[in-house]
Design a protein with these regions (language model features):
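N-terminal Sec-pathway targeting helices
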Residues: 1-16
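Hydrophobic alpha-helical membrane-insertion segments, chiefly the h-region
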Residues: 16-26
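Ser/Thr/Pro/Gly-rich low-complexity linker/stalk segments immediately outside membranes or between
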Residues: 26-37
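Conserved beta-strand hairpin/beta-sheet module of binuclear metal-dependent hydrolase folds
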Residues: 35-92
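Active-site HxH/HxHxD metal-binding segment of metal-dependent hydrolases
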Residues: 76-77, 86-125
Length: 125
Protein backbone atom coordinates (compact mmCIF):
# COMPACT_ATOMS: atom_id res chain seq x y z
CA UNK A 1 0.00 0.00 0.00
CA UNK A 2 1.41 3.34 -1.03
CA UNK A 3 0.76 6.22 1.34
CA UNK A 4 0.38 9.52 -0.49
CA UNK A 5 0.41 11.88 2.43
CA UNK A 6 1.34 12.38 6.02
CA UNK A 7 -2.38 12.47 6.81
CA UNK A 8 -2.88 8.93 5.43
CA UNK A 9 0.12 7.73 7.41
CA UNK A 10 -1.25 9.32 10.59
CA UNK A 11 -4.66 7.69 10.05
CA UNK A 12 -3.05 4.30 9.42
CA UNK A 13 -0.93 4.57 12.57
CA UNK A 14 -3.96 5.61 14.62
CA UNK A 15 -6.00 2.63 13.36
CA UNK A 16 -3.15 0.19 13.98
CA UNK A 17 -2.65 1.60 17.48
CA UNK A 18 -6.34 1.18 18.26
CA UNK A 19 -6.32 -2.41 16.98
CA UNK A 20 -3.22 -3.16 19.06
CA UNK A 21 -4.86 -1.77 22.21
CA UNK A 22 -7.98 -3.87 21.69
CA UNK A 23 -5.97 -7.03 21.03
CA UNK A 24 -3.70 -6.50 24.04
CA UNK A 25 -6.73 -6.04 26.29
CA UNK A 26 -8.39 -9.19 25.00
CA UNK A 27 -5.16 -11.16 25.19
CA UNK A 28 -4.63 -10.10 28.82
CA UNK A 29 -8.14 -11.19 29.77
CA UNK A 30 -7.77 -14.50 27.94
CA UNK A 31 -4.49 -15.17 29.74
CA UNK A 32 -6.20 -14.81 33.12
CA UNK A 33 -8.46 -17.77 32.36
CA UNK A 34 -5.94 -19.96 30.57
CA UNK A 35 -6.90 -18.78 27.12
CA UNK A 36 -10.47 -20.03 27.25
CA UNK A 37 -13.78 -18.35 27.16
CA UNK A 38 -17.23 -19.79 27.61
CA UNK A 39 -18.72 -21.58 24.62
CA UNK A 40 -22.37 -22.27 24.00
CA UNK A 41 -23.08 -25.94 24.88
CA UNK A 42 -24.98 -27.94 22.30
CA UNK A 43 -26.25 -31.41 21.44
CA UNK A 44 -24.03 -33.19 18.94
CA UNK A 45 -26.26 -36.23 18.47
CA UNK A 46 -28.62 -38.19 20.68
CA UNK A 47 -27.30 -38.05 24.24
CA UNK A 48 -23.87 -36.65 23.26
CA UNK A 49 -23.21 -32.96 24.04
CA UNK A 50 -20.41 -30.41 23.67
CA UNK A 51 -19.71 -28.76 27.05
CA UNK A 52 -16.19 -27.41 26.47
CA UNK A 53 -14.76 -23.92 26.22
CA UNK A 54 -13.82 -21.86 23.17
CA UNK A 55 -10.46 -23.60 22.72
CA UNK A 56 -10.68 -26.75 24.88
CA UNK A 57 -13.13 -29.53 24.07
CA UNK A 58 -15.11 -31.47 26.65
CA UNK A 59 -18.12 -33.69 26.13
CA UNK A 60 -21.08 -34.93 28.16
CA UNK A 61 -22.68 -38.32 27.51
CA UNK A 62 -25.97 -38.63 29.37
CA UNK A 63 -27.78 -41.74 30.51
CA UNK A 64 -30.55 -42.81 32.89
CA UNK A 65 -28.05 -44.28 35.37
CA UNK A 66 -25.70 -41.30 35.32
CA UNK A 67 -23.57 -39.24 33.01
CA UNK A 68 -20.00 -39.33 31.70
CA UNK A 69 -17.79 -36.29 31.09
CA UNK A 70 -15.01 -36.82 28.58
CA UNK A 71 -12.02 -34.57 29.39
CA UNK A 72 -11.88 -31.72 31.86
CA UNK A 73 -9.76 -29.09 30.17
CA UNK A 74 -7.45 -26.93 32.24
CA UNK A 75 -8.24 -26.24 35.91
CA UNK A 76 -9.79 -22.93 34.80
CA UNK A 77 -12.00 -24.79 32.30
CA UNK A 78 -13.86 -26.80 34.95
CA UNK A 79 -16.23 -23.97 36.00
CA UNK A 80 -17.05 -23.36 32.32
CA UNK A 81 -17.81 -27.08 31.85
CA UNK A 82 -20.02 -27.15 34.95
CA UNK A 83 -21.89 -24.05 33.73
CA UNK A 84 -22.43 -25.69 30.33
CA UNK A 85 -23.75 -28.87 31.95
CA UNK A 86 -26.19 -26.81 34.02
CA UNK A 87 -27.22 -24.71 31.01
CA UNK A 88 -28.21 -27.91 29.21
CA UNK A 89 -30.43 -28.80 32.19
CA UNK A 90 -28.22 -31.49 33.71
CA UNK A 91 -26.75 -31.67 37.22
CA UNK A 92 -23.01 -32.11 37.84
CA UNK A 93 -23.95 -34.44 40.74
CA UNK A 94 -25.42 -36.88 38.19
CA UNK A 95 -22.01 -37.31 36.53
CA UNK A 96 -20.76 -40.75 37.60
CA UNK A 97 -17.61 -41.07 35.46
CA UNK A 98 -14.94 -38.59 34.39
CA UNK A 99 -12.94 -39.99 31.49
CA UNK A 100 -9.51 -38.56 30.64
CA UNK A 101 -8.58 -39.21 27.00
CA UNK A 102 -4.89 -38.29 27.27
CA UNK A 103 -2.33 -37.14 29.86
CA UNK A 104 -2.09 -33.49 28.85
CA UNK A 105 -3.12 -30.54 31.04
CA UNK A 106 -5.65 -29.34 28.46
CA UNK A 107 -7.50 -32.67 28.83
CA UNK A 108 -7.03 -33.56 32.50
CA UNK A 109 -6.21 -30.35 34.35
CA UNK A 110 -9.80 -29.65 35.39
CA UNK A 111 -10.72 -33.19 36.39
CA UNK A 112 -9.89 -32.68 40.07
CA UNK A 113 -12.32 -29.76 40.29
CA UNK A 114 -14.98 -31.72 38.40
CA UNK A 115 -14.43 -34.77 40.62
CA UNK A 116 -14.81 -32.69 43.78
CA UNK A 117 -18.04 -31.16 42.45
CA UNK A 118 -19.55 -34.41 41.19
CA UNK A 119 -18.10 -37.20 43.33
CA UNK A 120 -17.58 -39.15 40.09
CA UNK A 121 -15.04 -41.90 39.48
CA UNK A 122 -12.03 -40.88 37.41
CA UNK A 123 -11.03 -43.17 34.55
CA UNK A 124 -7.99 -42.62 32.34
CA UNK A 125 -7.41 -44.10 28.92
Amino acid sequence: MLLNSKRQLAILLAVLSLVALVLVGRWGNARKIGGQGPAEPFRIAGNFYYVGATDVAAFLITGPEGHVVLDGGYPTTAPLIMASIAKLGFDIKDVKVLLNSEPHPDHGGGLTVLQQASGAQLWAS
